[in-house]
Amino acid sequence: MAKTSMKPDPADTVAEALNPELESDAKVAESRRGVLIALPSWVYLTVFFALPLVIVVVYSFATRSSTGLTRLTGWNLDSYRRLFDPLVAQIAVRSLVLALATTVICLLLSYPFAYYIATRAPKWRNLLIVFVLIPFWSNFLVRTYAWRVILGSDGPLAQLTESLGFEPIRLLFTNTAILIGLVYGYLPFMVLPLYAALERMDWSLVEAARDLYANGWTAFRKVTWPLSRPGVIAGSILVFIPSLGAYVTPALLGGARTTLLGDYIVSQFLAARNQPFGSALSVAVMSVMLVAVIIYFRSGAKNL
C-alpha cells in the first residue's frame, strides 16, 4: 500500500499568508499557556525562597535592642562589622577547611569508583548506580545517628581496637568525626556528576592516545582528566556548598566542642536571639556559595 503524506491544506496556507496576525496570535496564546504552566513554580519560589531571602537581607541591617528585640529602624552595618571578630574568623576558617577537606576526600574516593562504573557493561552500570543511591533510601538524620553509634566510646570501632590490644579509638565529638560524617553524606553528590562526565566521554580518544604510545598516566593526564573536568567541578560544587553550611552532621558528631558556621548561625537565631547578626552571617555564607555557583556556570559544567 502506498504511503500517503500529510500535506498542509492550501486554504490554510493562503489564509496564513493573507492574515499574518494569525501566527502572531498563536505565539501569544502559546506564551500565555507557558506562563500559566510556570505560574505555580514561580509562586512557590517567590514565597518560599525569594521572600525569605529578602527578609534575611533586611534583618542583617537591623538593630538589636538590649532586651533582645529586633528593630527595623535605624539600619546600620554593625552586624557586618562583627563578621571580622577573631571568634567568627576562627569558626569560618574551621568550616572552610572542613568543607575543602570533605570535597578533596570525596573527589579522591569518587573518581576511581566513577571511572570503574563508566567502563563497565551497561547492565552492571545500572546496578552500581543503584548501590550509590542506596543511602538516599534512608533518612539523613538516621544515617548520621548511625555514625554516632559507630564512633562512640562504646561503639564497634572502639571495641575492635580494644580487642586488638590497642587503646580504644574515640572519634566522637571531634573534627575527624565531622569529616567522616560529611564525606559519607555527600559522597554520592560527587560520584554521580563524575560518572555522567566519564560516561559521555569519547573513549576512542583514549585509545588513540595509547596507539600513539602514551602510557596510562599520560593518557589520563592528557585526555581523560581534561574531558572529565566538568564533572569534577560540578561534583566539587555540589559537595562544597552543603558542607560549608552543614548543621546536622556537626551538631550530632561534633557536639559542643566543635562549632561550625551552621551551628553558630543557629545559635545566634535561637540561643542568643541576635537575629541581625545571624542574618549577616547567613548573607556572608550565601555570598561564598554564590561565588561557587558562578564558578560552576562559567566552567562549562552546566553542560552536564
Where do the PLM segments sit?
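Membrane-interfacial helix termini and adjacent extracytoplasmic/periplasmic loops
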Residues: 23-27, 71, 77, 144-183, ...
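Hydrophobic alpha-helical transmembrane segments of polytopic membrane proteins
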Residues: 178-181, 237, 260-296
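Short membrane-interfacial helix/loop motifs at transmembrane-helix boundaries
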Residues: 50-88, 150, 154-155, 255-256, ...
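C-terminal transmembrane helix and the adjacent membrane-cytosol boundary/short C-terminal tail
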Residues: 2-20, 25, 195-206, 210, ...
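Glycine-rich helix-loop "coupling/hinge" segments at transmembrane-helix boundaries
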Residues: 67-72, 149, 247-275
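Transmembrane alpha-helices
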Residues: 39-51, 130, 134, 184, ...
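Transmembrane-helix boundary motif in ABC transporter permease subunits
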Residues: 29, 101-133, 149, 203-206, ...
